[in-house]
């Protein structure tokens, strides 16, 4: 296990937001102000912590701390929810000696209920006192909801002869039964980067990774990704080295994104949908999303069924432009469809073993241009329905 | 049971396209040339019968016959599939003494395999000989695939003191395991209507009905709706009476569309998503489709779960314009969400009984304009996954 980036301390405590007794409040503090960036849900209903974090970052792209609670989403909670969110930042900031405006909040859990402020008041001093006693692995564990495993990715790179470290923690595309998916992630880096450069690298990395995974297409009111770079390694990254840092950042987020799909509710497969030859990237994305969201394709993958017809039908209704006879569909390296017809390969036999694995690749070549896109998607399983159809009758 | 429209005869035979011995080839013949219209799948991969039927109708909007086979879709079959389709029309036309150009084909079943032409040659004379020995109920039964029940809707109306009859037959949004959904429908009318007027009434009725139902969002290579009006009642419908006929036609198709959702694979619910107050109808449609396609909403309905959060989240990611605090969500008449927050009603108790029923209404008021849209959607159930995840390993 590689070390965590320098200059960040972690704390987790059980505040009692959840029914079971387990850490449900997690804090990261940077010893010095860190360059900070955030990407948030595009849902029109935005949770209070999303609104507050966005405000803090747009006022000044600098942060000293990130505080995340699980168990309560503080979404659809009106003005009281906004006030409560700001109060939690005051409580945590005061306990740690940090301005509230430099604390970034995120929440995940049941929506529509107000935060238990008494529990926050009780927990904040304990949280501050615990700083340095926990690791980023503890942090990843404390933000879990229905996740089957904590999600951590680490990376080191050498810049100007010195080691720069990155670590990312995430919680899952596994939904919060009985509410909705919330994806939260924090990535930390001990390089010094200008706010403009960090923002650019961060948005680009998120776009190439988290924005290209799907479990069920539902996005939550709380989805949040934060990136903090505090300079504690003593290395300033600029000029040509920025590309190296961007590559490492993308790698960390890509590994977390893969884990999100792997741990999607009830998922048994990680389907990699690779579309090429589209008129442009946007049409390639439309094809990838139509295939990756198709209930029929997702159940076929669960059923280990080399069902080219469902893939072809999804491609055909995606709205993308192409000639039917130019499309080639390949599943796990076996060509299923070409010249408007299934190939004459015995693909049921050829694919029996490959489709038993966790990773399934669907290559779709449209023959209409150079646009391409890649999406990771989960399958649709009995356990997905079990988890989400919680009979109350 | 009301009578069938005058001047149409029906025949069904077992041609052997399916594994089990049952009628799988069905024919309608009109005694006189009928004004004909068709609506077809928008999927870019179009089955041979879709291409041929479209050609026949665009050459001349008149038909004497409709022939439908189940068991083989004749989709993704290349040039040979096109030739075979035209040959089937020759065979049926010759057997019935009708020009092949006035026979409209549709097919449903396994895709990617060529039609069994020997079976068509053997069956065509038997089919012609059986004309008049079967009813429209037999027709509806012969075109079934995985449908749980045949789908028929009838309607009479008086125009100028004379009875005009309509009958519609459909097969289902239940998928053809292990391939894809195919929806086929034929509506017959014994009024005389000009091609222009019939086309307009028919497209409008399809748009208000079949285009507003969804089981899983997947559309097939073969989806087809035909409408034939043969004038055998002796009544010519024109002028103000056209609105009456249009209303009756829409009613017939609406009842069939409801049955398609009711019989969606594994479905236990028919969810009526009614969106109002959108900026325009297109945004209302986007909201209705996002909610109706949401796996989380669909599993919640299956689970009889008054889960306002999932509905709100789907509304929020639909892309429609509105203020979060203006949205009102009502489930089976019980207001769940208003002013950006859940209402304080005890909706779990209030909705326990209503959510046990088959029909569930979701009203979504956006408060942003006058746009509205209504969509019928099925739920997502264990049986859906059972039916579509056919383990081959």
From Swiss-Prot, chains A, B:
Listed pathway(s): Amino-acid biosynthesis; L-arginine biosynthesis; L-ornithine and N-acetyl-L-glutamate from L-glutamate and N(2)-acetyl-L-ornithine (cyclic): step 1/1; Amino-acid biosynthesis; L-arginine biosynthesis; N(2)-acetyl-L-ornithine from L-glutamate: step 1/4
Protein's gene: argJ
GO molecular function, one term: L-glutamate N-acetyltransferase activity
Extent of the signal sequence: none
Active-site residues annotated for this sequence: 182 (nucleophile)
Oligomeric form and interacting partners: Heterotetramer of two alpha and two beta chains.
Entry-linked HAMAP family: ArgJ
Role of this protein: Catalyzes two activities which are involved in the cyclic version of arginine biosynthesis: the synthesis of N-acetylglutamate from glutamate and acetyl-CoA as the acetyl donor, and of ornithine by transacetylation between N(2)-acetylornithine and glutamate.
The protein, known as: Arginine biosynthesis bifunctional protein ArgJ
Pfam families (alphabetical): ArgJ (PF01960)
Site features described as Involved in the stabilization of negative charge on the oxyanion by the formation of the oxyanion hole, chain residue numbers: 108-109
Record's subcellular location: Cytoplasm
Matches recorded under InterPro entries: Arg_biosynth_ArgJ, ArgJ-like_dom_sf, ArgJ_beta_C
